[in-house]
Amino acid sequence: MEFEYSYNSTTTESINENLIYEDFQNLKTQEIISYISLYFNNLINQNYKNKNKKKERQNDDFYSRKIPLLTIEKYLNRIIKYTQIEKSTLIISFIYILHIIEKGKYIICKNNIYRLILSSCLIAFKFNEEKNYFKNSYFGKIGGINLNEINFLEYSILSKINYQLYINENEFYFLVEQIIKNEK
C-alpha cells in the first residue's frame, strides 16, 4: 500500500467527483475496513521500527497498557456490527485520526490505535448520522471501556482536531479515491 495522507486544496483538481461518487456507492464497507486496518497496521509497524517505545506514551491520552486481542480489522467490524454506522461515517472517523497524525509528533502504536478508532467513530457518528441514538456508555461497552474513559477520549479527540468536525467534500473524495485505487 502506497498512501501518505497529503491532502490539500490543490490536490483535488484531478478528482472527478461524479465518478468517485458512483464508485463510493459501489464501495463495500468491508473494503473500507480492510483499507483502514492495512493503513494502520503498516503505520504501526513503521513507527515501531523507527521510534523509541517510551516516546509513544508521552502525552498520549489514548494509551492503554492492555491491547485488545482483536485485530484492527476485527475491532472495526465489531464497531460496525453494534452501531451499523454508515460508510461515510467510517471514512470521516478515519480522516479525524489522519488529521491528528498530520499535525505531527503523534505516534500511532498498538497501545493507542483502538481507543483512537473507537472515539473517532463515536464523534463521526454523532456528527454525520441522523440516527444518533446511542449513548456514550454504549460505545464504551463496544470498546471495553467505561463511561468516564469514553467521555474523556471524546473530549481529547475533539481537542486534538480543534473541534473541526466538518470534512469538506473534496477531502472526503480524495480519501475515497485512495481507497478505490488500493482495491484495484
Functional labels for PLM-detected ranges:
Residues 113-119, 123-124, 128-150, 154, ...:
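Alpha-helical bundle/repeat cores within regulatory domains of eukaryotic proteins
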Residues 1-88, 92, 96-108, 151, ...:
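Acidic, Ser/Thr/Pro-rich regulatory low-complexity segments at or just upstream of the first helical elements
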